Amino acid sequence: MSPPRKLHIKSYGCQMNVYDAQRMVDALAPEGFVETANVDDADLVILNTCHIREKASEKVYSELGRLRVARDEAANHGRRMQIAVAGCVAQAEGAEIIRRAPVVDVVVGPQSYHNLPQLLAKAEQHGRALETEFPIEDKFGVLPQPAPDAIRARGISAFVTVQEGCDKFCTFCVVPYTRGAEMSRPVAAIVEDVKRLAENGVREVTLIGQNVNAYHGDGPDRLAWSLGRLVRRLAEIPGIVRLRYSTSHPNDVNDDLLAAHRDLPALMPFVHLPVQSGSDRILAAMNRKHTADDYRRVIDRFRLASEAIAFSSDFIVGFPGETERDFSATLALVAQIGYAGAYSFKYSPRPGTPAADMAEMVPAAVMDERLEQLQQLIDQQQSAFNKAAIGRTVEVLFERAGRKPGQIVGRTAYLQPAHVMAPDSIIGKVLPVRVDSLERYSLLGELASATSRPADAMAATGA
């Protein structure tokens, strides 16, 4: 029997890439690959790339330079290391990657991960393999399912892709070009995925997509289901106690989703709703197709559905042409909404996007100053949100052992890390925790009760 081949995947960027990395592991497991955390031991290294942030391509080529050294060292010991570039940089640059970095054996776009075994074999025979087309077949229908042991090893929380691609064409964003048009998976396939996860110990599922609330998958009644209707079906699955979704677009929030937040205890009251700017002028230049007031009204609709809902968001400072007045409008929006957390970034041009050709680039020093000012406000809001938990009892889903002996770590409904001293038998359970103090962004406390119910019992009762 041949010894297993070792696989190392380095993922950059979004939650979708984390999910994609797991599916690549699943696709390669039948070929005898097992994961390793040590890149130097790997027979195959995959860089699972992201094209959203600044200098994404340069980071990939820098990493490939380091891998060339590791590959040469492996060859000196009589071992062949294959190198693959996957993800959105692979989709955007294709053959250019092989031209600039001959060390690369395989370049594969996000829609073709199910073909990885064949691409690796092709590279073994012919030296290189490239696949960045958008194939007709649904990759989700042909990717192997993870083995039960693999599911259990990944913990009690899992991602499930329900939607991929984007039709919004924001002027700063490459996603429509690298992930393609919006595609929604059938309801039945998603239900089967989540059932399989629940049967193997998963208690929390995050539904992911580039524009997840645009979900419109075919249901068993042959009608297109909304995200809200899908969530209702998934909440019925025994064992699933928490459901989340990310990332959303304000224009696709509908009554079905709001009603699900109103009615379903399993749907967590924490919504990531990017807005990018508080200036109507900049929002128009970004092609967001909504105004700041439109966004405020969406927030109000969520809060009417459930007073418990809190929000996070994404912001870009220094978009071409952004003035001090535009930036002040962003600060005003943040101050008015009050976020539990948010991500802020300096604008960086993505080749091939309309914004990359816009004039009036904001000076780097101005962007730095605005980013610092915005992040200070966001940090203040996040700190206030976390401090409000002190003295309260909150529900925590416990996930794993902590760094300290006897410490168990879980997360609240708002994704705040929570630490208690307790036996590891509480992992997989939702328990009340009395919060005593904070340590940076984590809540510290004690179990509020010695009695508990496992997460699957809570899911079944709707608690």
Swiss-Prot record:
PROSITE patterns named in the record? MTTASE_N, MTTASE_RADICAL, RADICAL_SAM, TRAM
Keywords tagged on the record: 4Fe-4S, Cytoplasm, Iron, Iron-sulfur, Metal-binding, S-adenosyl-L-methionine, Transferase, tRNA processing
Q: What does this protein do?
A: Catalyzes the methylthiolation of N6-(dimethylallyl)adenosine (i(6)A), leading to the formation of 2-methylthio-N6-(dimethylallyl)adenosine (ms(2)i(6)A) at position 37 in tRNAs that read codons beginning with uridine.
Q: In the UniProt record, does the keyword NAD occur?
A: no
Its name, as the record gives it, is: tRNA-2-methylthio-N(6)-dimethylallyladenosine synthase
Give the required cofactors.
[4Fe-4S] cluster
Which top-rank group of organisms is this from? Bacteria
Its organism's taxonomic lineage begins at: Bacteria, Pseudomonadati, Pseudomonadota, Alphaproteobacteria, Hyphomicrobiales
Q: Which PANTHER family match?
A: CDK5 REGULATORY SUBUNIT-ASSOCIATED PROTEIN 1 (PTHR43020), MITOCHONDRIAL TRNA METHYLTHIOTRANSFERASE CDK5RAP1 (PTHR43020:SF2)
Q: Does the keyword tRNA processing apply?
A: yes
Residues covered by the Radical SAM core domain = 152-384
What does the record give under GO molecular function?
Answer: 4 iron, 4 sulfur cluster binding; metal ion binding; N6-isopentenyladenosine methylthiotransferase activity
Query: Pfam families from the xrefs?
Result: Radical_SAM, TRAM, UPF0004
Q: Where does [4Fe-4S] cluster 2 bind?
A: C166, C170, C173
Task: Give the source species.
Answer: Rhodopseudomonas palustris (strain ATCC BAA-98 / CGA009)
Leading EC class: transferase
Q: What is its EC number?
A: 2.8.4.3
Q: Which residues bind [4Fe-4S] cluster 1?
A: C14, C50, C88
Question: Where is this gene product found?
Answer: Cytoplasm
Concerning HAMAP family, the annotation shows: tRNA_metthiotr_MiaB (MF_01864)
> Could you tell me which Gene3D superfamilies the record lists for this protein?
Methylthiotransferase, N-terminal domain, tm_1862 like domain
Textual note on the cofactor: Binds 2 [4Fe-4S] clusters. One cluster is coordinated with 3 cysteines and an exchangeable S-adenosyl-L-methionine.
Q: Which family does it belong to?
A: Belongs to the methylthiotransferase family. MiaB subfamily.
Gene Ontology cellular-component annotations: cytosol
Q: Which residues form the MTTase N-terminal domain?
A: 5-125
| Quaternary state and interactors | Monomer.
The residues covered by the TRAM domain are 387-449
